Amino acid sequence: MITSRTVSSLEKIFHDSEPTCASLSEMSMLGNERASFQLAYFSDEDTQCGISVSGWKPENIKIYKVVEINSDLPAFEDSDFYFLRKTPGLYPDMLEPVEDNSFFAESGHHGSLWIELDASGESAGRHDIFITVSKGKETVTNVITVDVINAKLPEQELMCTMWFHCDCLATYYKVDVFSEEHWNIIENYVRNAANHGVNFILTPLFTPPLDTEVGGERPTVQLVDVKKTKDGYEFGFDKLDRWIDMCRRCGIKYFEMSHLFTQWGAEHAPKIVAEVDGEKKRIFGWETDADSEEYRDFLHRFAAALTACLLYTSDAADE
């Protein structure tokens, strides 16, 4: 047997606890908005289930399974009381795309599907959305009414950024950094971020020195090419230009340049790789004091070159 009901996207469905939240029967959205809700389900046996959504244009529907991930430290000892749980365990977090309208329901587990609707191209008015879960000959259908308001959400005025770590994408998908495959993956993620309200992107001039163990390194993701010469440094901005063009194409308007000093005190330089005598070498990093004469000289030269690049890029975009 399988049971299901629609609930708010703000709810958290834990596998070991029956949800006590209210069901969601109605919601509204503007004519160019995206909105989401969840289908909470429970199965008394391991089974492959079918899922179908009707009453909305298929191309404007995305369905994900909410996957729990392990958290060893959900909260610090001195945290406040505004937590659903504080114990180590599994927490609903990752959205895994449902393929072939099918998902696996674990025996005795509560779970949820995340359903995203895009109102683009939908007519104004009330729409009854039918969500059907099938298990063999057994089917369960839930209905939620979506009111599409005859107005459009104005362009976002807030500057919204989320730290975007493209080294993680290279690691997860096992591709070379800034290979064509990596660029394609980055663009897909940037476009998805822009579609969900992000208009400000972390831009890795050099490998961002963020969330990195002291003395450790993240995989190198450096958009600026650096060459050390007898007279100082030469800088290449081809990858940065490509990054900016790609982000603008995806809907990004603002660029947050990666930090020029390490996190938690700004005591050191970030990892910077340069061509030295024909070889790629790390020339700055944890061993470099932030206020060292050599790094200050580098920043002085780099700032001038970067400013000229960005001014040119801005003028070209205006034309």
Feature annotation, model-predicted:
Residues M1-S25, M29, D44-E45, E138-V177:
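Long, low-complexity ectodomains and other extracytoplasmic segments of secretory-pathway proteins
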Residues I2-C21, E45-I115:
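Surface-exposed binding patches on compact interaction domains or structured appendages
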Residues C21, N32-Q38, E122-F130:
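Short, solvent-exposed loop/turn segments enriched in Ser/Thr/Gly
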Residues M27-R34, D44, E106-H110, A124-G125:
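Solvent-exposed, conformationally flexible loop/turn segments
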Residues D78-M94, F164-C168, P209-C250, A266-R301:
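Aromatic- and acidic-residue-enriched carbohydrate-binding clefts of CAZyme catalytic domains
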Residues S102-Q156:
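Extended acidic/polar, glycine-enriched regions
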Residues Y312-E319:
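Conserved small/polar residues in nucleotide/adenosyl-binding loops
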